[in-house]
């Protein structure tokens, strides 16, 4: 059983982090080393369908901080933890709002690439146009010859000089093959092959 005073400390730490009064480094340093804090917050996380065991996740990072999607997941969990305990707070951290702002616009085959979120934000941070407009803009940036890739892990679509290369084709498809090659072409016609293990 967790003492109320201990939970109060956890809630205060979470509020400081989500409101931008504590850096990710500071929060991660406290959070990743406190098994009771992890367990208490993990209970809230389990109530959500996106649940991913935090202790396993932390162990898999081997002391490293999470990447963009891990940070989004962490911030959503912290936010839900505060909501569950009726703690008023403002979401000042940047990753969670950025993800939620653009996630429904980004096509599935690009949704695993955090760079796409930042590209959209740089293109129009005020989100003044329709979702269709942004979707068309993404298609202009991430071109493909005949068909789009089925899906790619994280930031594997090559971008050179700020411009994504044109996708040509892939060998195999996710969930059917353990090894997939994605073929791209530069403007000068030279080819780039990205190897991915499913």
How should these model regions be labeled?
Residues 2-198:
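Long compositionally biased, domain-poor regions of proteins
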């Amino acid at each position: 059983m967790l003492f109320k005073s201990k939970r109060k400390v956890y809630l205060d730490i979470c509020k400081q982090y989500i409101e931008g009064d504590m850096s990710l480094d500071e929060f991660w340093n406290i959070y990743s080393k406190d098994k009771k804090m992890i367990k208490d917050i993990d209970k809230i996380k389990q109530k959500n369908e996106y649940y991913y065991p935090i202790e396993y996740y932390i162990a898999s990072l081997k002391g490293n901080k999470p990447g963009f999607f891990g940070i989004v997941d962490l911030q959503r969990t912290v936010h839900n933890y505060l909501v569950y305990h009726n703690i008023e707070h403002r979401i000042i951290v940047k990753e969670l709002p950025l993800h939620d702002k653009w996630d429904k616009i980004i096509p599935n085959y690009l949704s695993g690439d955090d760079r796409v979120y930042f590209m959209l934000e740089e293109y129009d941070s005020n989100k003044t146009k329709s979702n269709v407009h942004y979707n068309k803009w993404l298609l202009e940036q991430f071109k493909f010859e005949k068909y789009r890739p089925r899906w790619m892990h994280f930031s594997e679509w090559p971008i050179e000089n700020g411009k994504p290369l044109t996708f040509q084709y892939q060998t195999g498809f996710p969930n059917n093959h353990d090894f997939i090659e994605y073929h791209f072409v530069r403007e000068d016609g030279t080819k780039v092959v990205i190897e991915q293990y499913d």
